[in-house]
Amino acid sequence: MIQHLALDALQRHLAGSPLYAWATSLPAQIAARIEEGHGDLARWWSAVQRLPQVQAPTVELAGRFALHSERDAALQPQVKEALQGLIPWRKGPFDFFGVQVDTEWRSDWKWSRVSPHVDLRGKRILDVGCGNGYYQWRMLGAGAESVIGIDPNWLFLCQFLAAKRYLADLPAWHLPLALEDLPEKLEGFDTLFSMGVLYHRRSPIDHLLALKDCLKRGGELVLETLVVEGDASTVLVPEDRYAQMRNVWFLPSVAALELWLRRAGFADARCVDVSLTSVEEQRATEWMRFQSLPEFLDPQDRSRTVEGLPAPMRATLVARKP
């Protein structure tokens, strides 16, 4: 499996950069992770291998993710069966040869809110908590030089490799690692995305400091997270669950989040978007059949979660490493 992560190509791509030494250490580190394994990894990898080995002469990444060929209709039964072996699909949507993968999240909506505020042309990008790589492909569509995503979830890796099967030559890599697995002071990326990660961290300031260590001087952080209304002293700490999630720790106001960024050493922090998450943007589908946002909100008051807390509201902030 490790050869399909294209780590040799990543080393060639990073030769001569501050990230090259790190790249040379990755094969041993990831081989050890694969050795640890996961009970479902063989089944998920088998689904990827059942995808037809064909070319995708038509690729769309700028306005959406879509792969097409002249044989779309003939390919669709095999493609759909293989991709259904990777359910649940959280982030998307994807169009594989006319098979519409209607994911739990309309991630294209978030991307339409975020992308106008960052110039990715020619940038080397790190996407922390990249999920199945949907945003990595969209970043390439926005002109990024290369995108490395990290996420320790094996299902997400296999979903990424399903797309990479048809986009092998594009400079996108998914590493099954957490931020904590990266060396300190990498300082090699122009732009870093952390979307939907901060509220899962027990120590949000430490997370921001670790993100800053990955950026070059002058590099840009794009931070998207759950927020609440309030001033710079407002932070919600759920007593137990938030929208049925146990691993949510801190929901700051936008003003508090800007303060956190300044304390972590970032400059020029600005909020570029605040949006309530709608039940049209996050919901169960054929490709993600479990409970989703409609079940996590109070049925009598959609402005509250089932726990009585403010319904999900997300902010995107952009800041610079001086």
Swiss-Prot record:
EC code(s) of this entry:
2.5.1.-
Show the catalytic activity: carboxy-S-adenosyl-L-methionine + 5-hydroxyuridine(34) in tRNA = 5-carboxymethoxyuridine(34) in tRNA + S-adenosyl-L-homocysteine + H(+)
Q: Which UniProt keywords apply?
A: Transferase, tRNA processing
**Keyword Transit peptide among record annotations:** no
- Keyword tRNA processing annotated: yes
One Gene Ontology term of the biological-process aspect is:
tRNA wobble uridine modification
Give the top-level enzyme category: transferase
Q: Give the molecular function GO annotations.
A: methyltransferase activity; transferase activity, transferring alkyl or aryl (other than methyl) groups
UniProt binding sites for carboxy-S-adenosyl-L-methionine = 91, 105, 110, 129, 179-180, 195, 199, 314
Looking up InterPro entries in the UniProt record yields: CmoB, Mo5U34_MeTrfas-like, SAM-dependent_MTases_sf
Q: Which CDD domains match?
A: AdoMet_MTases
One short Pfam name that applies is: Methyltransf_9
PANTHER family to which the protein is assigned, alphabetical: METHYLTRANSFERASE, TRNA U34 CARBOXYMETHYLTRANSFERASE
The free-text function statement in the UniProt record for this protein reads: Catalyzes carboxymethyl transfer from carboxy-S-adenosyl-L-methionine (Cx-SAM) to 5-hydroxyuridine (ho5U) to form 5-carboxymethoxyuridine (cmo5U) at position 34 in tRNAs.
Self-association and partners: Homotetramer.
The family annotation for this protein states: Belongs to the class I-like SAM-binding methyltransferase superfamily. CmoB family.
- The entry's protein name is tRNA U34 carboxymethyltransferase
